[in-house]
Each structure stands twice: as structure tokens, then as C-alpha cells.
Design a protein with these regions (language model features):
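Strand-loop microenvironment adjacent to phosphate/nucleotide-handling motifs in alpha/beta enzyme folds
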Residues: 1-25, 138, 172-353
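N-terminal Rossmann NAD(P)H-binding glycine-rich loop of SDR-like oxidoreductase domains
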Residues: 26-47
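Conserved S-adenosyl-L-methionine
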Residues: 44-53, 140
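Conserved glycine-rich Rossmann-like NAD(P)H-binding loop of the short-chain dehydrogenase/reductase
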Residues: 49-63
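Conserved residues in the N-terminal Rossmann fold of short-chain dehydrogenase/reductase
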Residues: 58, 82-83, 123, 272
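Conserved Rossmann-fold cofactor-binding substructure of NAD(P)-dependent oxidoreductases
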Residues: 80-101
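Hydrophobic/aromatic anchor residues within beta-strands of the central parallel beta-sheet
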Residues: 81, 121, 184-187
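Conserved Rossmann-fold NAD(P)-dependent oxidoreductase catalytic core, especially the SDR/UDP-sugar
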Residues: 101-104, 108-112, 116-164, 168, ...
């Protein structure tokens, strides 16, 4: 059996490509659109759909320039680039004119940076979420999907707490929208292989620079992992599934950080440096307290508002099953683990992408 076979077996029902939304002829806006997710999202949407417009909204002029070079108008005539910050409510509202779908990916997401700059973290992750909701409601956007993180479940750091607050804002926004207004949902997933600032390129850079060792915070530490392609497909399929008020959680494998380091640089020794402030030993995506509101949808879980029995009935009719009382979906209890062969294959696919 080849490495590709191992990975195919592991993700056999986890491509997250079904169902798909109808984005042909639609206007789509991505906040934080110049990041790793945004660029993969553009490629995915361009390959599958013929959108009327795809608006990239971000605050970094250089990244916007680089992305315009990577996506030239001759090949991507539907692309539009807006300089703006989610902290700027007026600019957001201007950018959302005639927009059908918003994918909210803008965030300050690095744990130590958020801890050291708490006011900035709150302004972007919490006030920014409020501004996105307000602009979407005022502009009559059809659907908004907000990207979250496993760190928002039982948070122990400011980044996680700010994303939990953001999640609550988006879920509660449905109450302001009314029955025929904007539909809001949240997607919550783990670490993205190869994304900017993640541990994979960090380990790769150390190995390439001739480091004598790789720093490991704790040899027991585990994390959920997902590829960029899977992340984009999960967002798109959740957009198609959503009726408003859900938190969608993908079923994805876990791995130990020490195994990841060993696959990237098997020749380098590892040095335990201790868990940093705000870090968890293991991550959780469905806490026990949310189990009673959670349904199993085969390739994902959906956490529902406790006050919406009609929404629960809708997903049960689609084959959703309640999870057991006391259920917890955490990286250390996850039954799906990446072994060395599958991990190497996963890294190879990520690097090729």
C-alpha cells in the first residue's frame, strides 16, 4: 500500500466536497482574503464556479499587490481588491454593497501576540466580528460564514476567548436578522497544515537553516490537523448546509507534535521547552457542555442553538444523530490519528499545493 493510499483511506469520507453551494453569478467577499485560506479559497471558487465578483478585503497593501500578481485580471476578471480593516465599520459596509455571501477569515490569531496586545486582539476579533454582522445586516447579505478555531472551545488564552466571543456574536446575529434575513453560521476547525505562522513551516525553516534541534513544548501535546483544501471545502459545504445559527466542526485526525517534528526533520533531536502561556496540552472542538446540543452528521458535527427545536429536527431529518451524553471531541481522545506514513503523505500533499 502506498503513502497516497494511506491518506486516501484516512480521509475516505472526509473530502468535505458535498454538498456544494450555488455560487455561479453571485458576489462573494472574503475578509482577510490575502491570507493562506483566502488564496486557496479563490483557486477553489475559480475552478468550480463562475462568480459575478469575488472581493478580497484586507488591510495589507503589499499582500494585496502580491495577490493581484498571482491572480491576474486576464485570467480572473471577476476579482476585486478592497483595502480595508474589519475594525472600520463604514469601509466594511461600503465593501458589502450588492454582496451575496461573506466569508469572514480576518483575525489576529497568534496566541503570544494576542496575549501581549490584548486591546488589538479585541478590536480585530470581537469588534471586527460585530462590524461584519452589522454591515451584513444593513446590506442585506444572504449568508455569512465565520471561520473560528478549536481554541474557542473552553478557551485558556485571549485569542481563544476573543474567538469564542466572535462565535457568540455570529450565532446571536440570527436573532437580529429575522426569519428572512441574513443567515449566519460558524465553522470551527484545528491547525491548518502549511498555513502562514503554523508549526509546519516553522519546523521546516529551522531544518533548512541547519538548526541543531527542534523545540517541542511538551512530548504529550496533540493537535487536530486539516489541509487548506479540506478547510476551503469544509467552509463551502457548511455554507450549503447552513440554515442559520450552527457551529460546524469537521471530523479530522489528530497527531502528536513530536511525531510531526520527527517526520519533518527525523535527523534532528528534540528539546522540550515547556508549554507556553496560554497553550493547552490538548485541544477540544466539542466540549462536554455542548454535547447535548450536538449532532453527528457523518463527516462533521453540528452544534445547534439550544432554543431552536426546528433546526434540530431539520438536521435529524437529514440523518443527523445525537451524540452520547458526556461526549467530548478532543485531540487526545480522537480515534483517528495520523501515523508516520499518512503524516508524511499529508505533508507532501501540503507542500505540493
Amino acid at each position: 500500500m502506498t503513502l497516497a493510499d494511506d491518506l486516501t483511506r484516512l480521509f475516505e469520507h472526509r473530502s468535505f466536497q458535498d454538498p456544494q453551494p450555488d455560487l455561479d453569478g453571485k458576489v462573494i467577499m472574503v475578509t482577510g482574503g490575502t491570507g493562506s485560506f483566502g488564496q486557496h479559497f479563490v483557486r477553489r471558487v475559480a475552478a468550480r464556479y463562475t462568480p459575478k465578483k469575488l472581493i478580497i478585503f484586507s488591510r495589507d497593501e503589499l499582500k494585496q499587490y502580491d495577490m493581484q500578481m498571482a491572480f491576474p485580471p486576464s485570467k480572473y476578471p471577476f476579482m476585486r481588491f478592497f483595502i480595508g480593516d474589519v475594525r472600520d465599520a463604514a469601509r466594511l459596509e461600503m465593501a458589502m454593497r450588492d454582496v451575496d455571501y461573506v466569508v469572514h477569515a480576518a483575525a489576529l490569531k497568534h496566541v503570544p501576540i494576542a496575549e501581549y496586545n490584548p486591546f488589538e486582539c479585541i478590536q480585530t476579533n470581537v469588534i471586527g466580528a460585530q462590524n461584519v454582522v452589522t454591515a451584513a445586516l444593513r446590506r442585506g447579505v444572504k449568508q455569512v460564514v465565520a471561520l473560528s478555531t478549536d481554541k474557542a472551545a473552553n478557551p485558556v488564552n485571549l485569542y481563544g476567548a476573543s474567538k469564542l466571543a466572535s462565535d457568540k456574536i455570529f450565532i446571536a446575529a440570527g436573532n437580529m436578522a429575522g426569519a428572512d434575513g441574513t443567515c449566519f453560521c460558524v465553522v470551527r476547525y484545528g491547525n491548518v497544515v502549511g498555513s502562514r505562522g503554523s508549526v509546519v513551516p516553522f519546523f521546516q525553516r529551522l531544518a533548512a537553516e541547519g538548526a541543531a534541534e527542534l523545540p517541542i513544548t511538551d512530548d504529550r501535546m496533540t493537535r487536530f490537523w486539516i489541509t487548506l483544501d479540506q478547510g476551503v471545502d469544509f467552509v463551502l459545504s457548511s455554507l450549503a448546509l447552513s440554515r442559520g445559527g450552527e457551529v460546524f466542526v469537521p471530523k479530522i485526525p489528530s497527531m502528536r507534535t513530536v511525531d510531526l517534528a520527527r517526520c519533518i526533520a527525523p535527523h534532528l533531536p528534540q528539546r522540550i521547552i515547556g508549554i507556553r502561556p496560554g497553550e493547552k496540552l490538548h485541544e477540544v472542538m466539542v466540549p462536554e457542555d455542548e454535547a447535548r446540543s450536538t449532532l453527528d452528521l457523518n463527516d462533521r458535527f453540528v452544534i445547534l442553538p439550544s432554543d431552536d427545536p426546528d433546526l434540530r429536527a431539520h438536521f435529524i431529518a437529514r440523518g443527523g444523530a445525537p451524540v452520547p451524553e458526556g461526549f467530548v471531541y478532543s485531540s487526545d481522545r480522537n480515534g483517528e490519528r495520523l501515523d508516520a506514513r499518512a503524516l508524511q503523505s499529508l505533508l507532501g500533499i501540503s507542500l505540493a499545493a
